[in-house]
Amino acid sequence: MTTLPKQPFGRDASLDGQEVELDFAREWVEFYDPENPEHLIKTDMTWLLSHWTCVFGTPACQGTVAGRPDDGCCSHGAFLSDADDRANLDDSVKKLTDADWQFREKGLGRKGYLEKDELDGEKQWRTRKYKGACIFLNRPGFAGGIGCALHSKALKLDVEPLTMKPEVCWQLPIRRTQAWVDRPDGSQILKTTITEYDRRGWGEGGADLHWYCTGDPAAHIGKKQVWQSYGPELTELLGEKAYAELATMCKRRQGLGLIAVHPATVAAGPH
């Protein structure tokens, strides 16, 4: 049997072996949206029943850019998906004070908190990079604490962070794709797929990330499974009734026993 070499993913050699391979067995469940019989939802049970959790602010988070562990996955700024996403961000910014946002003066200054960058061959808005990372990222030493100013403010206001952050930020590391599918009888349905936003989700640049959390056992230490810890986000992506159906499916699958357990969750040990 031929043994294929492990792909380095652009990491330092000292980090090799820490992340599991990208390709492994997954279990999927499909169900129809209770509110729309022409909407099929395909869900990755291997990911949703994993114990991944965000480890930002701990030694386990090594950052996607070498030498910048305190950035987490915020080094590159966030592309805005559409006009609504930008309007929501603008509203969120109005709620931030100097005590919330380390770079508020810069963000509200002449250069602003957004800049144009290329995505898929087009110029699109993204949050501005300032001193090597997203301008909304509070750095070590800031009295208000490190991390996303928008996320922290949402917690202070006792609202879900997804209500204040750009879409790409609160969805990560959930990946939702949608496509119209032709059925054999000529009818069409909308198919939504929910899965892990792994390195490949970042496109060609994903292979060059210094480190990425979803494949590292050190990030699979959550007390709750992803379908539970990301309940608000999944509800926003699918709708309340569809999420309730998904939750029922996850509970049932967990009770029966998952065959294709996420290898990073396995490597992390008992939960």
Question: Predicted regions span which residues?
Answer:
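Short loop/turn segments that flank or connect secondary-structure elements
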Residues: 1-271
